Swiss-Prot record:
GO terms for cellular component: NuA4 histone acetyltransferase complex; nucleoplasm; nucleosome. Component of the NuA4 histone acetyltransferase complex which contains the catalytic subunit KAT5/TIP60 and the subunits EP400, TRRAP/PAF400, BRD8/SMAP, EPC1, DMAP1/DNMAP1, RUVBL1/TIP49, RUVBL2, ING3, actin, ACTL6A/BAF53A, MORF4L1/MRG15, MORF4L2/MRGX, MRGBP, YEATS4/GAS41, VPS72/YL1 and MEAF6. The NuA4 complex interacts with MYC and the adenovirus E1A protein. MRGBP may interact directly with MORF4L1/MRG15 and MORF4L2/MRGX. Residues 1-15 have a biased composition (Gly residues). Residues 1-27, 128-204 are annotated as: Disordered. The modification Phosphothreonine is found at residue 22. The lineage of its organism: Eukaryota, Metazoa, Chordata, Craniata, Vertebrata. This is MRG/MORF4L-binding protein. Belongs to the EAF7 family. Keywords: Acetylation, Activator, Chromatin regulator, Growth regulation, Isopeptide bond, Nucleus, Phosphoprotein, Transcription, Transcription regulation, Ubl conjugation. Component of the NuA4 histone acetyltransferase (HAT) complex which is involved in transcriptional activation of select genes principally by acetylation of nucleosomal histones H4 and H2A. This modification may both alter nucleosome - DNA interactions and promote interaction of the modified histones with other proteins which positively regulate transcription. There is a cross-link at residue 127 (Glycyl lysine isopeptide (Lys-Gly) (interchain with G-Cter in SUMO2)). Residues 128-140, 153-175 have a biased composition (Basic and acidic residues). GO terms for biological process: chromatin organization; positive regulation of DNA-templated transcription; positive regulation of double-strand break repair via homologous recombination; regulation of apoptotic process; regulation of cell cycle; regulation of double-strand break repair; regulation of transcription by RNA polymerase II.
Amino acid sequence: MGEAEVGGGGAAGDKGPGEAATSPAEETVVWSPEVEVCLFHAMLGHKPVGVNRHFHMICIRDKFSQNIGRQVPSKVIWDHLSTMYDMQALHESEILPFPNPERNFVLPEEIIQEVREGKVMIEEEMKEEMKEDVDPHNGADDVFSSSGSLGKASEKSSKDKEKNSSDLGCKEGADKRKRSRVTDKVLTANSNPSSPSAAKRRRT
């Protein structure tokens, strides 16, 4: 088809989604009959009106840019279509592609009551969590007190063990002393020459 010519004037309009940034030279198009024919060919199967108008415009822009051999922003296409058609009226008259009936709606009282009860339960849970956050200090004191009593009990048991061991040591020491005394007496009796048994031996 024909090539689009660059002119000096620009047009104002809204940009659609997916539009790439372009230079001022690309934003101006001289709409010759050949260029308009390219636009109409690009619009086959796509209506730039209704709720999906921006998606259709993306397809129109891509096809139109491919036909004329240069990138054209969708703003330029919107502005040119606005000079030929009443786009706002067409948009309002476009039938929605899906059912969209409007009817009055009242939220059931049961749901409102459930929401209120849920809020009360959440508040109670938050209060319990706050109490648990404060209570761990008391629990730590209980742990410390119980550990202290355990420490005292272990100290008592160790002292009892020491007493028993010392008592056993004293008894063993006394027994050793008694044994040593007996052996000393026996030795002195055998070694004493004045004993009667030694005298008898000498006489014989």
